[in-house]
Amino acid sequence: MTSHSVTAAAPSSTANLGPGFDIFGLAVNAFDDFVTIERSTTTNPNHSNISMREHFRTDEASFPVRIEMTGQYHESIPLEVSKNSAGLAIQKIIKDFGIKGSFSVIVKKNIPPGFGMGSSAASAAAAVMAFDTLLDLHISKPDLVRFAAEGEKASAGSLHYDNVAASILGGFVLVRPFPTVPEFIHIEPPKDLHLVFAIPGLEVPAKKTELARKVLPENVSLGHVVHNLSNAATVVAGFVLKDVNMIARGIEDIIVEPARKHLIPCFDNVRASALDAGAFAVTISGAGPSMVAIVSGEDRLEAIANSMRIGFGQCELTCTTIKCSPSKGARIVSKK
């Protein structure tokens, strides 16, 4: 039976995990974005009535995608297709497959945007999953990741695979972006891996990820590269061996983190406080400003969360903490 509406959910994620810049992604069950794709009853967005125009916009009068934003964090998300990660990802599928018709895209934005939690990636991931199911396209998971990565241009200004790969595939993902066709290697995380995210009460600029990339060094020493490669290999080995302690030993970055940590008030205080409370490792989540601590088991989670709140409090910043664990990937939640 043909569906007229499909809803998919995709989880938040953390990228880099220290030395794995643009390479490592981990899906986490802290938040989910939901995207519903509906076949429109009209063939042109300009034919919609006034009340619908208050919710929908399109870049071109002839383009068949209309976007509606709902959810806790919807207000800061652009409705224009070219500036919306879900819209861009679907636009790429439509163009590549030569799809006809018009579609409504309803994004329930539950993941705070701009805080290093894979917010734009989750919307793009859920969008491509729902669109693929609605049209019965049978797109492979790796190709869904590649389509979703188009959406990252909306927030980062260029293609990025780490967060979208994690949101679609779930678990820990290693990205090989440089072959002609990028490759995504999935590894199931240890069952005792737990995380605490500290989300500081900061105002983040538009396209924060793009700005955070501008502070990175253009040249690094061979010694620093070897150091980070060793740590990145240790992280991967830890995931393969299901050893949280080994993962934590590898979460040390001497290239990207030193360049970015000044963008996060009280970074050193928060990190030291969390380590004192029992965290195995602490690093920036993605491009920040959120920070993430990892630990084995659940016993110390609340103590670590409290320590991170205290750490940010030393800079007179409020802080929201989220205790979570690795997540499965994007999923279909309803068909109508």
Regions found by a protein language model. Give the residues of each.
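Short beta-strand-to-turn element immediately C-terminal to the catalytic PLP-Schiff-base lysine
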Residues: 38, 166-178, 293-296, 333-335
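ATP-binding N-lobe of GHMP and related small-molecule kinases
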Residues: 1-115, 133-139, 169-170, 326-329, ...
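Solvent-exposed alpha-helices and their adjacent loops that cap or buttress functional pockets
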Residues: 1-2, 16, 26-29, 97, ...
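Short beta-strand segments
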Residues: 9-11, 27, 167-169, 176, ...
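Acyltransferase
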Residues: 190-272, 276-277
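Gly/Ser-rich oxyanion-binding loop with an adjacent helix/lid
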Residues: 95-182
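Glycine-rich beta-alpha junction loops
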Residues: 12, 30, 41, 199-204, ...
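Glycine-rich, charge-dense phosphate/pyrophosphate-binding loop(s)
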Residues: 239-336
